[in-house]
Curated annotation (Swiss-Prot):
GO CC field: cytoplasm
Keyword vocabulary terms for this entry: Cytoplasm
Protein's recorded name: Regulatory protein RecX
Entry-linked Gene3D superfamilies: Winged helix-like DNA-binding domain superfamily/Winged helix DNA-binding domain
Length: 267
């Protein structure tokens, strides 16, 4: 048995106390622990009492960590659980803390999904598939994901998708077919469905300025020809050059005309 000889308020936190047993510092305790066990100077504690106090204090430590972690932004159960594990809270205490967070609505996965949906639609250029992935990564239940992804699709305006496509298109140069492919790939990577992507692409004008396209073809021709002549010569060199340029999206008649203009066909 031990005796509580002193309980003092901690200097840096008025809601925590230092507990002294038999004149020796034993541990710091939270105000809730103090009240729950009605601890006071002169009280005699059995070993079982100390075990219960330590377990409860560990639980309270976990709650305080969780609340502080949740104070910065909304979190999911998975995120809170990982945070507590990283801070060496026991598995039993973690589950108790998680249960507490649900009871007090500190954790609410539907609220989390709603908030993330609004944030992504209003501040990012990402589509519903990226939204789905983010929900999955933080441990949101499948039924909630399947409920909120269609809502995301419905609330994200088609005009916004077209604007994203236009911005992508402005950064690309080259033949029409290649730019179309790059815009399609970029939109898919941003999480838009193929159906929405194809509808958006149908609204865009991919025609390129002929002078700019001619300059690009000339530059690509020089690069490709220089590279291919290290391996081939004669007619084979010409064919390999044409094949490479066609894979880049240039039309055969434009390539042939540029080859004639460059004098390569006469070599």
């Amino acid at each position: 048995m031990t005796k509580i000889t002193k309980i003092e308020v901690q200097k840096n936190n008025k809601e925590r106390f230092n507990l002294f047993l038999d004149e020796v510092f034993e541990m710091g305790i939270d105000i809730d622990t103090l009240v729950r066990f009605n601890l006071k100077k002169g009280q005699i504690l059995e070993p079982s009492d100390m075990e219960n106090i330590q377990k409860y204090e560990h639980y309270r430590l976990g709650i305080n960590m969780a609340i502080q972690y949740l104070s910065y932004k909304k979190r999911t159960e998975k995120e809170v659980r990982q945070h507590l594990q990283q801070n060496e809270i026991s598995d039993i205490a973690i589950q108790q803390v998680i249960d507490y967070c649900y009871r007090e609505s500190y954790i609410n996965h539907e609220d989390y999904a709603e908030s993330l949906k609004n944030t992504m639609i209003n501040t990012t250029d990402k589509g519903p598939e990226i939204f789905r992935q983010k929900l999955y990564q933080v441990g949101i239940e499948p039924n909630i994901i399947n409920t909120y992804v269609p809502i995301y699709e419905e609330e994200q305006s088609f005009e916004a998708v077209i604007e994203v496509a236009k911005k992508i298109m402005k950064t690309k140069k080259g033949p029409e077919i290649k730019i179309r492919q790059k815009v399609l790939q970029s939109l898919i990577q941003k999480g838009y469905s193929m159906d929405v992507v194809q509808q958006a692409i149908a609204e865009l004008n991919f025609e390129q300025d002929e002078n700019i396209l001619d300059d690009l073809l000339q530059k690509d021709l020089e690069k490709v020809y220089t590279k291919q002549r290290r391996k081939y010569d004669g007619q084979q060199l010409v064919m390999k050059t044409i094949e490479s340029l066609m894979r880049k999206g240039y039309k055969y008649d434009k390539i042939k005309s540029k080859l004639e203009e460059s004098g390569i066909l006469d070599e």
